[in-house]
């Protein structure tokens, strides 16, 4: 069973690599090597890196040697682990956060992967501005697009929903809960972000394809596409006053770089490599671009470079003479979100077990906060804690807590909380590790947390809701899979990514089933926690991230 669509460009980029001579690695046929490359790209590279040097996941080079600060050395590698041990790890997962692949890959594929990762990593080709230009498709020039909204849909309450394994995006009308349109996009769209105007949806696929969708047509229409590289995760527009939607930035995992485009046509303008030194002073050949966000304080983007731990503030006022401020934080930067004041961006340095906070006004690191294992905020959640004032919350992939960090506020009534700022003020207990996303809304008194990566079905298929008025109370568990009314399936149906509607009174959860199983979007009333609606449709296949236009446009969380 192989996951299907992977864009031809991304695949040919990876498959173009020749077979190298291997010492000590088990024999493989050419066909097995091709299968290994495809599965590695689709399933493994995100955590372990194309060059397999490790980040969220472990180093998977055939042989590695580490020298500690005290001069002692440690050696290891996939060759040392051998095929049998690797098959076990891939099949059953590990306590360190690696999920079990025995319900995703066949036995033969697990065996192929166990042998493939004992080979020297294949290095895919680079991707230049010329390659980007060649991939650029302007399907509808800006002056030929509608001059006003041509439909009657309340665009602010539209949800863009990733249909992960189909290479498609569903646009659902949040008012009527009807599917408005399902569009082709890149493979396994990672995130959708909105234009400052709320008219356009930008999506980026894992295969590096950016799709620009115009919501003003009778039905949503793709007006431009462009490739950023072979593997990407992030995209955002310029949002500062006077620059709204003028530019778009996209970050790639491979090659490690970010690209700047025209915001309305996607015309490629510039590529900047992120290769360089880590905060520990070592050169890294694959420092991937993780989250990117448009600053509210200045005409800048916050670009988080995973492996180096460097946070770049990219000033977009003069693209030809680009100025960048590079802020040292901690290695393995991943996802993050704004604090309540939208002055500080908090980003997880996940495998360093830290949260880094950037002050976008001063352009400096505001804090580096130690947390429990592998924080994974998504965008996090902001609320006023009854005892500690404004806090930002993150869940953890690697531990059974939700961490609450006190954040600064210029409001007079919050002055008394200053002494707590940048401290972990509370850790809410969860039923286990494996959380990916937490969410709340300014109008809500609830904090929602999923647990899709927990190995227990009863946790992975449920969400937990905390009462913000009394955080010492145990959370309410909602069994999303059961509430969907769908029959139980062999593969886990992971309940993930709570997202509010525009009004802030409903929470939408993805019930992410196997590729051939019926999945669903399950909607709850935020006040009563009662089931409100289940959206099932043969087109809703492997739904994951959901992005409400208004909340994404205004960073409401
Ligand atoms: Fe994500 C955000 C990277 C796996 C769903 N994910 C992000 C961001 C990064 C990232 C860098 C922040 C983007 C930004 O804000 O600019 N994700 C990665 C990986 O490297 C990783 C671990 C492995 C991979 O191969 O991609 C990974 N992510 C997943 C999944 O398996 C998820 C659960 C399902 C899916 O669709 O692939 C998933 N990631 C998401 C979602 C967001 C996200 C829904 C956006 C959260 C938000 O609310 O903004």
List where the protein language model places each region:
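Axial heme c-ligation environment in periplasmic c-type cytochrome domains
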Residues: 54-64, 88-120
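A short, flexible beta-alpha/helix-coil linker loop
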Residues: 67, 95-97, 275-277
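Predominantly soluble domains enriched in secretory-pathway, periplasmic, or organellar proteins
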Residues: 21-27, 31, 50, 84-87, ...
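Short, solvent-exposed loop/turn elements at domain surfaces
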Residues: 55, 69-70, 99, 168-171
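Gly/Gly-Pro-rich "capping" loops immediately C-terminal to redox-active cysteine motifs
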Residues: 26-37, 53-91
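Gram-negative bacterial Sec-dependent N-terminal signal peptides
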Residues: 1-21
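Residues immediately within or flanking Cys/His clusters that coordinate Zn2+
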Residues: 41
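Short, cysteine/histidine-rich loop/knuckle motifs that typically chelate Zn2+
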Residues: 46
């Amino acid at each position: 069973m192989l996951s299907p669509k992977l864009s031809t460009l991304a695949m040919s980029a990876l498959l173009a690599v020749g077979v190298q001579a291997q010492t000590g690695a088990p024999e493989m046929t050419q066909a097995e090597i091709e299968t290994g490359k495809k599965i590695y790209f689709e399933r493994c590279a995100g955590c372990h890196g194309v060059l397999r040097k490790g980040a969220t996941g472990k180093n998977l080079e055939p042989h590695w040697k580490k020298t500690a600060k005290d001069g002692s050395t440690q050696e290891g590698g996939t060759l040392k682990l051998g095929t049998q041990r690797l098959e076990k790890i891939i099949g059953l997962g590990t306590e360190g956060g690696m999920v079990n692949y025995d319900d995703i890959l066949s036995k033969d594929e697990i065996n192929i992967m166990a042998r493939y990762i004992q080979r020297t990593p294949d290095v895919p080709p680079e991707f230049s501005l010329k390659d980007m230009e060649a991939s650029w498709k302007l399907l509808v020039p800006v002056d030929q697009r509608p001059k006003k909204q041509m439909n009657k849909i309340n665009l602010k309450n539209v949800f863009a929903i990733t249909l992960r394994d189909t290479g498609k995006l569903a646009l659902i009308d949040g008012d009527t809960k009807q599917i408005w349109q399902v569009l082709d996009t890149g493979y396994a769209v990672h995130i959708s972000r909105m234009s400052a105007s709320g008219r356009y949806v930008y999506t980026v696929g894992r295969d590096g394809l950016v799709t620009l969708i115009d919501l003003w047509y009778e039905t949503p229409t793709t007006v431009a596409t462009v490739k950023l590289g072979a593997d990407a995760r992030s995209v955002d527009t310029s949002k500062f006053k006077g620059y709204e939607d003028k530019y778009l930035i996209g970050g790639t995992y491979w090659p490690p770089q970010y690209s700047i485009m025209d915001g309305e046509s996607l015309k490629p303008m510039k590529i900047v490599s992120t290769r360089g030194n880590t905060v520990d002073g070592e050169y890294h050949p694959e420092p991937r671009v993780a989250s990117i966000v448009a600053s509210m304080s200045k005409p800048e983007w916050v670009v988080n470079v995973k492996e180096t731990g460097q946070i770049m503030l990219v000033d977009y006022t003069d693209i030809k003479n680009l100025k960048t401020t590079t802020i040292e934080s901690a290695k393995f930067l991943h996802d993050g979100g704004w604090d309540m004041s939208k002055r500080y961006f908090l980003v997880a340095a996940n495998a360093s077990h830290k949260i880094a906070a950037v002050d976008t006004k001063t352009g400096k690191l505001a804090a580096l906060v130690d947390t429990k294992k592998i924080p994974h905020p998504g965008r996090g959640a902001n609320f006023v804690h009854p005892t500690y004032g404004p806090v930002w919350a993150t869940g953890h992939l690697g531990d059974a807590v939700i961490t609450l960090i006190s954040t600064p506020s210029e409001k007079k009534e919050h002055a008394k909380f200053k002494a707590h700022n940048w401290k972990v003020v509370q850790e809410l207990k969860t039923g286990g590790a494996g959380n990916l996303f937490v969410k709340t809304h300014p109008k809500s008194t609830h904090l929602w947390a999923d647990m899709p990566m927990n190995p227990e079905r009863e946790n992975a298929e449920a969400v937990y809701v905390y009462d913000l008025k009394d955080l010492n109370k145990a959370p309410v568990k909602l069994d999303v899979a059961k509430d969907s009314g769908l029959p139980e399936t062999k593969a886990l149906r992971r309940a993930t990514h709570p997202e509010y509607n525009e009004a802030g009174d409903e929470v939408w959860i993805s019930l992410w089933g196997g590729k051939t199983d019926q999945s669903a979007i399950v909607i709850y009333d935020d006040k009563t926690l009662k089931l409100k609606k289940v959206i099932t449709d043969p087109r809703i296949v492997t739904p994951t991230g959901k992005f409400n236009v208004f909340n994404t446009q205004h960073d409401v969380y």
